[in-house]
Amino acid sequence: MSVSLSRLERQLGYTFKDQELMILALTHRSFAGRNNERLEFLGDAILNFVAGEALFERFPQAREGQLSRLRARLVKGETLALLARGFDLGEYLRLGSGELKSGGFRRESILADALEALIGAIYLDAGMEAARERVLAWLTTEFDSLTLVDTNKDPKTRLQEFLQSRACDLPRYEVVDIQGEPHCRTFFVECEINLLNEKSRGQGVSRRIAEQVAAAAALIALGVENGHE
């Protein structure tokens, strides 16, 4: 094992029994051969479960939608990339030459994906308890800063934060119709996001309100919120 990987293990607070799992977790799809995408898929599921379980225990009075919003804040790409930078994770990534030249080792989505892959690798290496312990340790500061006040955000903000947590493109809003007299108009808006096959719709007495209604409909369609808040 190289000295550099030993240093990373110290930063992560975990020593791998199977070094190949660690190396695979650090291998981007631009690199020849096997890559970390499957481990990322597994790590994402574990991260969401561990964060959800911890929030369920920490906020016993919170409603389902509030818990979902708190979790989205915890697991969003921005948060994961910040953690990854704290581990200097970019220095250890295996990237293809093109990705390396374009600065992929600094890219938020690549760093966040690699951290999720490491969570998946730890799970395969030592089981759920080891993965849970690392996730909770890494997110201690973020957990301690959360309050239910964080859930009092408008639907557009909540939708944007959810999409950012999944490293997805931001929603696109379009006014498709305006009806009524100038002093009493109704705006009709469509919200398009890549995760949904159909556009979400909203209407209101202003464009802003119609966009908020469309964003709320998108959150329900995604299964993030149930509409009974």
UniProtKB/Swiss-Prot annotation:
One of its GO terms (cellular component) is cytoplasm. It catalyses: Endonucleolytic cleavage to 5'-phosphomonoester. InterPro entries: dsRBD_dom, RNase_III, RNase_III_dom, RNase_III_sf. Pfam families: dsrm (PF00035), Ribonucleas_3_3 (PF14622). Its cofactor is Mg(2+). NCBIfam families: RNaseIII (TIGR02191). Belongs to the ribonuclease III family. Digests double-stranded RNA. Involved in the processing of primary rRNA transcript to yield the immediate precursors to the large and small rRNAs (23S and 16S). Processes some mRNAs, and tRNAs when they are encoded in the rRNA operon. Processes pre-crRNA and tracrRNA of type II CRISPR loci if present in the organism. This is Ribonuclease 3.
